[in-house]
């Protein structure tokens, strides 16, 4: 598994929430598995 650290200052912004969801979906699409921390 590959682990990638991600830091965002806030999640009360709709754009950042969509960004986080998209990153999670993309991470799950990799065959070896990527975990966003």
UniProtKB/Swiss-Prot annotation:
Transmembrane annotation, as ranges: none
Superkingdom of this protein's organism: Bacteria
Transport listed as a keyword: yes
Protein name in the entry: Myo-inositol-binding protein
One annotated Gene Ontology cellular component of this protein: periplasmic space
Coiled coil regions in record: none
Note in the entry: The molecular weight of the complete protein is approximately 30 kDa, there is a single affinity site for myo-inositol.
Keywords, in A-Z order: Periplasm, Transport
Localization of this protein: Periplasm
Family that this chain belongs to: Belongs to the bacterial solute-binding protein 2 family.
Annotated signal sequence range: none
